[in-house]
């Protein structure tokens, strides 16, 4: 492994991302594909880049990311969380700025389970008076 590599694990919904930061030119590889190929949606790409843009390090690191589980937005959120943790491993003084933006906290919201007798988690069957 490289001598100056920084690692961060990120999670969101049912997605988990492993992020490896290496000094470089700003290349982002997700599951052996580029950011543009992996995320078709512009919003997902923006979410991934948010912590790097905040601390002005977009072109300072190359990133190698593996992400599993969940959907597009969950995976993007997990990657953002992992990048944030890796940046904090690189430089702990960035923590305050990243926390203020809300990237350090793991978003604990999960899908609510479906209950017996209901159609979804909270949606009740239609009530008929007669």
Swiss-Prot record:
Q: Which UniProt keywords apply?
A: Ribonucleoprotein, Ribosomal protein
UniProt key word Hydrolase: no
Which segments does the entry list as coiled coil?
A: none
Q: Its Gene Ontology biological processes? A: translation
Q: Which GO terms describe its molecular function?
A: RNA binding; structural constituent of ribosome
Signal sequence, start to end: none
Listed under GO cellular component are:
cytosolic small ribosomal subunit
Disulfide bridge positions per record: none
**HAMAP family on file:** Ribosomal_uS9_B (MF_00532_B)
User: What family, per the record?
Assistant: Belongs to the universal ribosomal protein uS9 family.
Q: Kindly provide the name given to this protein in its UniProt entry.
A: Small ribosomal subunit protein uS9
Gene that this polypeptide is encoded by: rpsI
């Amino acid at each position: 492994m490289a001598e100056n590599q920084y690692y961060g694990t990120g999670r969101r919904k049912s997605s988990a991302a492993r992020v490896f930061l290496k000094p470089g030119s700003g290349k982002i590889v997700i599951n052996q594909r580029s950011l543009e190929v992996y995320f078709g949606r512009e919003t997902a790409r923006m979410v991934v880049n948010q912590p790097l843009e905040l601390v002005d390090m977009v072109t300072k690191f190359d990133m190698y990311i593996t992400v599993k589980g969940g959907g597009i937005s969950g995976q993007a959120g997990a990657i953002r969380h992992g990048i944030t943790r890796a940046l904090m491993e690189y430089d702990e003084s960035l923590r305050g700025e990243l926390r203020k933006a809300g990237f350090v906290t793991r978003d604990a919201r999960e899908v609510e389970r479906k209950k017996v007798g209901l159609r979804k988690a909270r949606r009740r069957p239609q009530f008929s008076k007669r």
